[in-house]
UniProtKB/Swiss-Prot annotation:
Catalysed reactions, as listed in the record: heme b + 2 H(+) = protoporphyrin IX + Fe(2+)
Function, in words: Catalyzes the ferrous insertion into protoporphyrin IX.
UniProt signal peptide: none
Enzyme Commission number(s): 4.98.1.1
Family per similarity comment: Belongs to the ferrochelatase family.
Organism: Vibrio cholerae serotype O1 (strain ATCC 39315 / El Tor Inaba N16961)
Pathway: Porphyrin-containing compound metabolism; protoheme biosynthesis; protoheme from protoporphyrin-IX: step 1/1
Any GO MF annotation of the entry: ferrochelatase activity
Localization of this protein: Cytoplasm
Keywords: Cytoplasm, Heme biosynthesis, Iron, Lyase, Metal-binding, Porphyrin biosynthesis
Family matches, as NCBIfam families: hemH (TIGR00109)
GO cellular component assignments: cytoplasm
Protein name (database record): Ferrochelatase
Any one Gene Ontology BP term: heme biosynthetic process
Gene responsible for this protein: hemH
Amino acid sequence: MNNHKKLGILLANLGTPQAPTSQAVKAFLSQFLHDQRVVDMSRWLWCPLLHGIILPTRSPKVAKLYQSIWMDEGSPLMVYSRRQRDKLAELSQRPVELGMTYGEPSLLEGVRKLQQQGVEQIVVLPLYPQYSATTTAAVFDGLAKALRQLPVVPELHFIRDYHDHPLYIQALAKSVRASWQQHGQGDLLLCSYHGIPKRYAQNGDIYPEHCLKTTELLAQALGLPQDKVMMTYQSQFGKEEWLQPYTDKTMEALPRQGIKKLDVICPAFSVDCLETLEEIAEQNQEIFLHSGGEAFHYVPCLNDSQSHIELMAALVKVDC
């Protein structure tokens, strides 16, 4: 990239509803579930199902879940994302803006804010360590669509993934060790990743390979033998088969296998959100304890930790 042109950073993530209300959640889910990267069914079949059944029934339920985790400053995903933006800007001494694939601030808004600061080159960092067409590629699609609305298109550099970056693995290991120091080490470290339909992987999505590599490297960094770490997939919906083993089913089975104290980390999530704070730290903890488990400790996402910000700065610096 041209070093004489001002460079800025766009941190991209999935997005979040604007408020923990049925109306706001419905608007967010509608945009999210309309993306063919997320659901690749025929639009003739999917859209009537989405608008006739899924959105009317799921939106009020999901809104209640958001209410249980909502912070004074807003949605956890947005709160931590803003902190990441501010800390990365301070560390890198470059303009940094947020762009969400769905919801606000949009990818287009993020690019425009950077251009208003005189930025001509943008490094796009999707905060998905493991590549998937359902997440990372959706950022690229959304950005390409956004650029059509700009009179001047900036020079762009995309960071596709960082699932095996040494600083990423070190940051994960540090967070696990901090949990062990506070709560003691459990019988097993379970790495729960957001799932995707199995068919997507069979059609070439490399996401499961990236998840496996991250898990292996994290186990090595922690000095854990193979029988002390496990990988599962969460957040599946619909009747189609998703990547397995499923996190919730595993929670039911582990106590019967002698696992009474469990540590859980979600390496695919760069910030805590509904899927980590509610689905894992609340729902799945309840499943594990109800099934005979004795202790469940959720290891928070990297969020705006110093090690995470240093990782981001390194990713941007190396790829410029």
